Amino acid sequence: MTEQKNKTSLIEFPCTFPLKVMGAVHPEFEQAVLDTVRLHAPDTQAHHITTRPSSKGNYTGATVQVKVENQEQLDNIYRALTSHELVKVVL
């Protein structure tokens, strides 16, 4: 038997995917997230991101609505965000 190369995904591409990002309270956090996402999804605009502080004010949460074409693009965005120094968690 041959191994099936196509993996089954629960996400239908292309789509607009909501990325949840948690990170440090920092004046550059929102712009850093936006710039990082734009490396892999250049059409992402400032109005695609919303931020809010955590309940205790220790972290900032951001949701970015990103148009992604395939799983590889989404994976690259996740990797870029998780490697950023201001980002703690990406969901």
From Swiss-Prot:
Disulfide bonds: none
InterPro entries with a match to the protein in the record: UPF0250_YbeD-like, YbeD-like_sf
Family: Belongs to the UPF0250 family.
Protein name: UPF0250 protein NMB1218
Species of origin: Neisseria meningitidis serogroup B (strain ATCC BAA-335 / MC58)
Lineage: Bacteria, Pseudomonadati, Pseudomonadota, Betaproteobacteria, Neisseriales
